[in-house]
Amino acid sequence: MTNIRKTHPLLKIVNHSLIDLPAPSNISAWWNFGSLLGLCLMIQILTGLFLAMHYTSDTATAFSSVTHICRDVNYGWLIRYLHANGASMFFICLYMHVGRGIYYGSYTYLETWNIGIILLFAVMATAFMGYVLPWGQMSFWGATVITNLLSAIPYIGTTLVEWIWGGFSVDKATLTRFFAFHFILPFIIAALVMIHLLFLHETGSNNPSGIPSDSDKIPFHPYYTIKDLLGFLVLILLLMLLVLFSPDLLGDPDNYTPANPLNTPPHIKPEWYFLFAYAILRSIPNKLGGVLALVMSILILAIIPFLHMSKQRSMMFRPISQVLFWILVADLLTLTWIGGQPVEHPFITIGQVASILYFSIILILMPLASLIENKILKW
């Protein structure tokens, strides 16, 4: 008799995705981030669901409902901080996952890569709207500043912004709709994840060498199930360290002041995971130009597959590209730092140099390095 997991219509899908899936024998810990992102999404949906049971999306009560969750709900503080810091872990895993894709040339799987970019945008939108919900000072002013950027769109900009706000400023209507979208988007993300995996399983995983691994496959279970579980353990440990020892480390103290439209905080800045894009936005003195640079800083990922000039897929055997890749990582860290600094000398100049370098590495230097490496191969 054939095993039920191979015949049952539902279990068959699980079997082909998680048990009998042929996987490369040499994928490193950098391939753990996909499953870690799945874990993060599950943590966020569960903690978010329990938070939504006690949260009220009304300007008069939103802030106090969050306070109520932290003070009066059983383990409410734990759920709230798991959700807030879970978002940080989510973005750490996301950026590592994307970085891995760039380093090892995984972007050559076009469909998987493009769904991944859509997922990145969806997660960023969800995180932004979630940050508005506690209705603190940074929530309110962050929402005001970021939504206002859309007014830079010619002709329809102002109308669009007022349509999104549901009025002439960020107010009750805005908060209510942001809560609605923040609730629905993670489920859309979960559906997109399924499509992401569907396309990935059409080709199979890439591996560090970038060489096809069809001749050397191992079953996903038990090898990579146990490896993923170890990853889960490390992620949960780090998340718990953050939540139980310094839950407000990555947050903004301004968000413990209730939203006040009459009082602007001295430094409006987003959460740390958006600071690099915020720095790129601020480094251009023109509003529309800044918005375009902001969008392009993420959308540039869609161009990367077409800039692949190398004869090799992975950067494993490409020292010049490796150096450029790590300069790019350092540049992104610099941008993250600059995004959190006030707009004054020398930070303005550093931000502008780092922004130019960011686009130069991806659009010009990386393809050039690939061509040079191709030449070196012939020597």
Swiss-Prot record:
Residues that coordinate or bind heme b b562: 83, 182
Lineage: Eukaryota, Metazoa, Chordata, Craniata, Vertebrata
The UniProt record lists the keyword Ribonucleoprotein: no
GO molecular function term, any single one: metal ion binding
Residues the entry annotates as binding a ubiquinone: 201
Disulfide bonds: none
Role summary: Component of the ubiquinol-cytochrome c reductase complex (complex III or cytochrome b-c1 complex) that is part of the mitochondrial respiratory chain. The b-c1 complex mediates electron transfer from ubiquinol to cytochrome c. Contributes to the generation of a proton gradient across the mitochondrial membrane that is then used for ATP synthesis.
Note: Heme 1 (or BL or b562) is low-potential and absorbs at about 562 nm, and heme 2 (or BH or b566) is high-potential and absorbs at about 566 nm.
Residues that hold heme b b566 according to the record: 97, 196
Topology within the bilayer: Multi-pass membrane protein
CDD domains for this protein: cytochrome_b_C (cd00290), Cytochrome_b_N (cd00284)
Protein name as catalogued: Cytochrome b
Gene field: MT-CYB
